Amino acid sequence: MEHLLAGLNRAQHEAVTATEGYVRVIAGAGSGKTRALSHRFAYLVNELGILPGNILCVTFTNKSANEMRQRIHALTGDNDTGYINTFHGFCVSVLQGDSHAVQYPKSFLVLDNSDIDAMLGIIYEERGLTLRDMTYSAARDMIEIRKLFKEPEYYKDMITMSLDTLREKYERADTAGDIIFYGYLYQEKKCFGLDYNDLIKFSLYIFEQHEDIRLKWQQRLEYIMIDEFQDIDALQYELMEVLCGYHGNLFIVGDPDQTIYTWRGANVKYLLDFDKVFPNVQTIMMMENYRSTPEILAAANSLIAKNGHRIKKDLLPTKPSGEKVVCHFADTQEAEAQWMAGEMQRLHDRGVPLRDMTVLYRAHYVTRAVEEALMHEKIPYTIYSGVQFFDRMEIKDALSYLRMIAYQDDLSFRRIANAPKRNLGKRRMAFLQETAEKEGTSLYVTLKNHLEDSVFSGTKAKQFVDLIERFSHSYQGRPISEVLSDILDKSGYEKALRTEGSQERLDDLAELKQSIYEYETSCGEESTMEHYLAHIALFSNGDVAEQGDKVKLMTVHAAKGLEFPYVFLCGMNEGIFPSRKVRTLPGMEEERRLAFVALTRAEKGLYLSEADGWNFDGSPRYPSRFLLDIDRELLSFTHEVDETLLREAADDVARRDKYLREDDGDGTLPIGQRVRHAVFGEGTVLDVDLNKGAHVIQFDGMGTPRSISLRAKLEKIGP
């Protein structure tokens, strides 16, 4: 026993040895909760003699589950590590054992997004739907919303209805929403497929309808432990209630200050109200932080204290003092990135490995300037959970349009001739390739010379050639940023992204345009198209080594649960972090919790930065409210603070706050929602502009989007 309890602090010791009944652990960031969970599992097995197969330990990611298994195996020496899994993974075990109860085979399919999109493709083709009716992304969201909220009993149709009856229901559907929803249920049943929502719903159905199966699992699971309880949703909570109903041994761990997934249905009230729901709950506060210096924790505590709806608690430092949190105000994104690269180089010169440095950000599009600065300084880096800026599909497509205008080369032609779709598929491209080789011409020239051939009838080949010809004869002397905006509009490329609902890709294109504008400003007369394309090739040749000592770049969401010696949190501006898409006060508190998560990833050094300049919509960019939230004496500023800038930033925050609602209500509409306006007719919501207090709507009968006040009356069409 001694080796399992050795080195544990008082709270950890209490958590490990409190084995019976209902136990809630409020565990702050870096407080050693994973250590407590793994040692508790080992304590149950090694000291109490509980069989591993009678313990359920739930984590929220497969990666966490694998790491937990490894830790427990090292402590117990037993290859049987019980049910250490995600909720969905556990439900797969239930269904594989008792799938006969829902008339499904043991070999059912677990569907991912690509499977769902393939099913949507079949439905759209069968019923003549297009992406104008609903994008795949919007369709997936609609299906999930209907399954969770609007038609939560849907699974009974899947289980009890015959395939023919489901097919008839699908065929009778006459609105896009119903066609897609019932078509999807039919396709699921047809291939015995279950998505993530189905896994829990089907398991709950089995437990509800078959007492013998429910009792079997309840009796088997003598001890249940759940990590990251602040991220649990209603279905997972219901499943947990069922499973612990026999033995009553439930151990939960969570931190209300790290609730960052409410957009996925997480509800922190399950953690906060745990002692009101279950009897004789023992609550353990695990606040000693073993990760960060006192200076980093002081800044994080100061930030999160500004949230009103929380358990008032502070992380307690255990590490010796370090340096103050550094805060840098830059004039431009480029200057911010150059400062970061310089600080990294200074750290590296002091002997800090590059792999100990991590750049965190709220959204991927802010990495462009950072990547350029790192490459310029020859600092190798790698992006986690994302693609390097100049390797992203939409950036490569946009640059290929510019190359087509300037060079009309085959590589660019292959990339964008059918982007957006012009019906120039594999067969016609093969014809072009073969003909080009015979005639000794480029693919583009070959297409120009053969536009009248029957093989190109029914395509938009002529429109494409006309587009390239028009731009190639007129681009010289025009600003490159203007040419790019123009061709992305005239080609229909940006419109196609809007139709798909690809807001992140549109943000990336806006960032590219901004970077070109800044390039033009800095280069003056040298800023020709050819010069720019040669310059940008240096940033997109992928010549950074894949292995070795590299800086890590990742979103804050991707960094959850991780820790890094030195953290650079960039893009700390209103509209970036917090996101411009936040519409409610609870949503703003979640953004602040996300910032808290970012700050508490740092072990030794934390660098916060923002950049002045202009937002995509032309409005001035101000420092984030989260920088203003932190007590100034806790920060080390790199230069004298501009008090006027901070006053203007505070005024900007106050102005934005006027548009934040108390709850989620119906004040704004989701992106992709179809609406009807009394004068303009039907259209699609493209975005919500909180700066203007408006929906951005593309009306069907208009060539360009319109900003419509949030207060204007709009009728929702469909789900």
Feature annotation, model-predicted:
Residues A18-T19, R24, N79-G82, H100-D198, ...:
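ATP-hydrolysis module of ASCE/P-loop NTPase motor domains
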Residues M1-K106, V110, C191, L215, ...:
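P-loop NTPase Walker
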Residues G571-T704, L710-P719:
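C-terminal accessory regions
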Residues Y170, P353, T367-I379, R392, ...:
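Conserved helicase C-terminal RecA-like lobe
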Residues V25, S31-L37, P279-Q282, M287-P380, ...:
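Helicase P-loop NTPase motor core
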Residues A6-T17, G21-I26, A36, L56, ...:
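Conserved helicase NTPase motor core
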Residues F90-S99, D257-T262, R291, Y384-A406:
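Short alpha-helix plus adjacent loop in nuclease-associated cores
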Residues S31, Q230-H309, K313-T318, E437, ...:
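Conserved helicase motor core of SF1/SF2 NTP-dependent helicases
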